Amino acid sequence: MKPAARRRARECAVQALYSWQLSKNDIADVEHQFLSEQDVKDVDIVYFRELLSGVAVNAGLLDSLMAPVLSRQLEELGQVERAVLRIALYELKMREDVPYKVAINEAIELAKTFGAEDSHKFVNGVLDKVAPSIRKKK
């Protein structure tokens, strides 16, 4: 699959995870609704589904990885930043095929696209502290 399709999968995953985090609906329902309402012709659907289900199943673990380095309580973290960080940490922890730098750079780009003005700096700072303990740089 092309890198652009993977990027679109991550973009869609941020949006769907944002919805899931706010609604607390079943992740399968969120996925179904998202796919029925969005134009996903240029999206790696398999990867989108894996990110969505993988982050949902491992949300507690992913949150526990980031919580110690946050400058605020996890509950105070913005929903966009939380979704972006969960995706990046999932890729670093569970997807050895995704290069270290790709996971971090993609998270920064997602934060620039969807987050508040300086959220990409926050995301970069958190990942800079957490990522080396999850996986060695390559």
From Swiss-Prot:
Function noted in UniProt: Involved in transcription antitermination. Required for transcription of ribosomal RNA (rRNA) genes. Binds specifically to the boxA antiterminator sequence of the ribosomal RNA (rrn) operons.
What's a single GO MF annotation on this record?
RNA binding
- Gene3D superfamilies associated with the record: NusB-like
Q: Which PANTHER family match?
A: ANTITERMINATION NUSB DOMAIN-CONTAINING PROTEIN, N UTILIZATION SUBSTANCE PROTEIN B-RELATED
Keyword Cell inner membrane tagged: no
Q: What is this protein called?
A: Transcription antitermination protein NusB
Instruction: Say which species the protein is native to.
Output: Serratia proteamaculans (strain 568)
Query: Which keywords has UniProt assigned to this entry?
Result: RNA-binding, Transcription, Transcription antitermination, Transcription regulation
Matching entries from CDD domains are given as: Terminator_NusB (cd00619)
Record keyword RNA-binding present:
yes
What the record says about family reads: Belongs to the NusB family.
